[in-house]
Every structure is written in structure tokens, then in C-alpha cells.
Amino acid sequence: MRKYVIERDIPKVGTFEREQLRDAAKTSNAALVKLGADIQWVESFVADSKTFCVYLAKDEAVIRRHAEISGFPASKITEVKRMIDPTTAAS
């Protein structure tokens, strides 16, 4: 599977309480169950009015389908080509 970063424009998401975030995660998980093994949610980073979600997926189409089922927008989908970290400097 490929790795993607999905930007989701969600007004005031950074002010959501823990319960609201838990409900959002439950909604996302329910959509993932419907889609099966072609997609996996890794983690999400919450900013003021958007989230940056990391997913493993077969292709971009399954990410768009997840957005449709969950009701969360996929404002921008970017495939991750490579990853680097501080240890990259030593290699």
C-alpha cells in the first residue's frame, strides 16, 4: 500500500473537545470497516481549522471513497514518495 497525507478543512476542529474528537474517530473507523483491507488510518494531526491525516491505501480512489462515507472532506490528497528523519543526515 502507498502512504498518503490528507488535508481536511474542518472549521474550528482545533477547538473540539475530547468527546467530539472521539466521535470523529469512531465515524472514520466505521468507514474503514466498510472499505476493508484497502485502507488503513495511521494517525492525524489536528490544527486550528484542518487536520492532516496519514493513511496507507491502495490508491487515491479509496481515500476519496472514505471521505464520502465518513462525511469528512479530503481537501487535498498527497502521496508520500519518501520519508526522511534526522538519521538521514548520517547515511
Identify the function of each model-found stretch:
Residues M1-V33, Q40, R82-S91:
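Short S/T/G/P-rich N-terminal loop/turn motif that feeds into the first structured element of a domain
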Residues R2-R8, F52-A61:
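A broadly tuned preference for mixed-charge, low-complexity surface segments
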Residues A24-T27, F52, H66:
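Residues within well-formed alpha-helices
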Residues N29, T51-Y55, D59, S75, ...:
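Short amphipathic alpha-helical patches
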Residues A37-E43, K76:
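A short linear hydrophobic-aromatic micro-motif
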Residues W41-V54, A61-I63:
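Amphipathic, hydrophobic secondary-structure cores in small proteins
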Residues L56-M83:
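An amphipathic, aromatic/His-enriched active-site/gating alpha helix that lines ligand/cofactor pockets
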